[in-house]
Amino acid sequence: MRYRLAWLLHSALPSTFRSVLGARLPPSERLCGFQKKTYSKMNNPAIKRIGHHIIKSHEDKREYRGLELANGIKVLLVSDPTTDKSSAALDVHIGSLSDPPNIAGLSHFCEHMLFLGTKKYPKENEYSQFLSEHAGSSNAFTSGEHTNYYFDVSHEHLEGALDRFAQFFLCPLFDESCKDREVNAVDSEHEKNVMNDAWRLFQLEKATGNPKHPFSKFGTGNKYTLETRPNQEGIDVRQELLKFHSTYYSSNLMAICVLGRESLDDLTNLVVKLFSEVENKNVPLPEFPEHPFQEEHLKQLYKIVPIKDIRNLYVTFPIPDLQKYYKSNPGHYLGHLIGHEGPGSLLSELKSKGWVNTLVGGQKEGARGFMFFIINVDLTEEGLLHVEDIILHMFQYIQKLRAEGPQEWVFQECKDLNAVAFRFKDKERPRGYTSKIAGILHYYPLEEVLTAEYLLEEFRPDLIEMVLDKLRPENVRVAIVSKSFEGKTDRTEEWYGTQYKQEAIPDEVIKKWQNADLNGKFKLPMKNEFIPTNFEILSLEKEATPYPSLIKDTAMSKLWFKQDDKFFLPKACLNFEFFSPFAYVDPLHCNMAYLYLELLKDSLNEYAYAAELAGLSYDLQNTIYGMYLSVKGYNDKQPILLKKIIEKMATFEIDEKRFEIIKEAYMRSLNNFRAEQPHQHAMYYLRLLMTEVAWTKDELKEALDDVTLPRLKAFIPQLLSRLHIEALLHGNITKQAALGIMQMVEDTLIEHAHTKPLLPSQLVRYREVQLPDRGWFVYQQRNEVHNNCGIEIYYQTDMQSTSENMFLELFCQIISEPCFNTLRTKEQLGYIVFSGPRRANGIQGLRFIIQSEKPPHYLESRVEAFLITMEKSIEDMTEEAFQKHIQALAIRRLDKPKKLSAECAKYWGEIISQQYNFDRDNIEVAYLKTLTKEDIIKFYKEMLAVDAPRRHKVSVHVLAREMDSCPVVGEFPCQNDINLSQAPALPQPEVIQNMTEFKRGLPLFPLVKPHINFMAAKL
């Protein structure tokens, strides 16, 4: 695939050509800017410039205005009278590249500290509490060049939130006690990443360049860099924070995006009032004209040992900063070709040789002044033995591009694809939208900020050739990641401990690559037949319903249909679940269902890639009930792709070589689960404990040896022999077309796979374990990789119903912010602290998830202590405060989906849970508004208090790798620490030694009854 900006270097942490833009409409008809109100800068000396003509999509109904304040802050205002949430973001064009050399992570630490009190609002959780009480949320991130802060809040409370937010940049406190505690949060955040291959590889890339270049810095920071070493060197970190903020948090390096229901004039006045006082220190914009990879860092090979059993090849070329060429984007053009996955592509040839599975290519951001061009592949076992040959093929393909020269029709196709994507772009959630815009305001003229990353305007063959000229063997760096290098390395990266070996690439290998000749198997892509040409929005049918309606109900299928009446874009979502009793009957069958679909997707890749480029994607995966298929995007060519997928499903022939490769990759992925985070392990074990049937990773690994090619070939017709299909077709589609699509799916399966219907008795869902009253169970396991503990504590409450859902959700709303403030900010238990509802198979409860260096039984005691404090907090809560929480939860629940796929996902969730409560939000919010404080206190005392008669609790304790054992319960007196509330004395829990025996001894809940009476709903 073409490398996209969101994709990191490493996997985490995808001519006579007809125009599709309405016969090349003039710009005034394709795109439009607003100038509905004439707001003159003469009205206010705080405004230096106003940009009225923000170019936007014709489909975008929001109003925009750009501002440059007198102090240099760039602003984009977005007036959206329909938004449920308002949002704002501020991006400071400073990041970890500007950290002082002796305090690594200071910019990141500064980001953390700004949340913890300001002169105007000194209470350290004032900002988060205000947002929580008004259905809001916030976050921030620090990168090499940016520190980005953002929030959302109910639309009525934008001004209050923005006022608190603005103080971050005017007068933060950097309180000493907060500083001492928050350094632990940064350290915990780093500790979470230490055994993560994505973070390790990123830091190693930085560490193997010029050590004097800012790119080489350790950006996250940890306790050593932010406390221990500064103390040793006599550095006052609080003073350094104040100095960093006063130096770099300058208005001329800031950009703001604000989105609200208010008019543009009101938004203008609000921003001017709150941000015009931010001081302009005229800080020069940091630029890095020298590339971190100089001649001595090129023609180098790095052999790297990963934590997980992965095999990757990273080929990197230093290139100049191409940012200023955004209107022609030569990196995009080359990434499109080198990263192509169709017939004749580089990936196609490498896969045919059995050397790689995936490929990503394209430009990668560095910082102002430098970039990289990357070609990354996932290696097979055979591919690891042919790295030189793989890179030779890369240079053969690059040579093909040189020989062909820049092709204007390819550029035109990219231009048209991007223009369609921009014109029919889905509406984003406000928080993500403002954060992104604030970040890119630094790079583009105000008028072009919405279009710059989409619209291509100038075909510049000279720039394409300039970048192509950088993709040469003498300009290359190569990194190979494989467990096979264990014990063969001689270097260790400082911050993450990554083991690696550095070697110069031999001259004869460089010469071999330089002499790469043309490979006749490489071809430029064919013209993309999936680019949509019909963008007609269909008229709403007379019988259109506000929610999905059942338009077909037979022994073979249930078809739900909903014509889009909200978004009016030429898109649709087609969701199918194929129920089969053979898909999950045992670990062997689960493995075979997985491999069948992985091989199927692998064989479809060349065909479906063109559709993906044209905005039409599909997802296919095995589930515990069978198979799930979704096809999303422009509806014009959607049936063509769907038909191809179903035909392939029904007639699939397995390629033996790909079978062995994908089976081996699957085994590695099962083994790699051991290296997931402790909190993820805790969630995994809890699911195994609570679900009636769930196969473990170990059971799947053991059964995988029994999956042979003949056995898998025999399994596929068995899987397809009897099915029940439940589908939701939703979007720019008619009822008749939906029925036709469903008939095509059924006919194809019947014709090629001789599929017959399932019996109704075979459509029963799995159920959830029912915990006994006053029961407390503990399950303990150890994580072999990470040096942190993880815990999930689950208080099972009851079956889902309108009343039970609202009791639980309102309680979660009330405790959410205090939980974070108490357990993370004040007690510093760890970076990951979460509370909220857990729902599975119609059963629900309250859960806490924590990852920490502290032992699980201590975390358990702190959660219990916190719950006791919340009982008093709720009892003492004023009616006004209680009603704020009800209103906040109501706003969250009634927050409208921003795009078709999000609305479809809500409806699909109702269908696959077999609850079918499509109007759930309105029904439950109406009930929510009747609740009283006494209802919640009663819910707590009955279900959650230590002595509650209907308390049902299970805890999963995941021990750190260096812990051999740990008590499941303990007492931790807090008299010596006045900041800690006293934990209750806990009874001795029942320790689960065997999952099967645990489940065998307990009853199961019944399934939740559907909201719809299907006998009445039948046509």
UniProtKB/Swiss-Prot annotation:
Active site: residue positions: 111
UniProt xrefs under SUPFAM superfamilies: LuxS/MPP-like metallohydrolase
Keyword Secreted included in the entry's annotation: yes
Single GO MF annotation: protein homodimerization activity
Gene3D superfamilies membership: Metalloenzyme, LuxS/M16 peptidase-like
Cofactor(s) demanded: Zn(2+)
GO cellular component: cytosol; extracellular region; mitochondrion; peroxisomal matrix; plasma membrane
Regulation: Activated by ATP, other nucleotide triphosphates and small peptides. Inhibited by bacitracin.
Residues with PTM N6-succinyllysine: 192, 697
Biological process according to GO: amyloid-beta metabolic process; antigen processing and presentation of endogenous peptide antigen via MHC class I; bradykinin catabolic process; hormone catabolic process; insulin catabolic process; peptide catabolic process; protein catabolic process; proteolysis involved in protein catabolic process
Binding of substrate, residues: 359-363
Entry remark concerning the domains of this protein: The SlyX motif may be involved in the non-conventional secretion of the protein.
Annotated protein name in UniProt: Insulin-degrading enzyme
Recorded name of the encoding gene: IDE
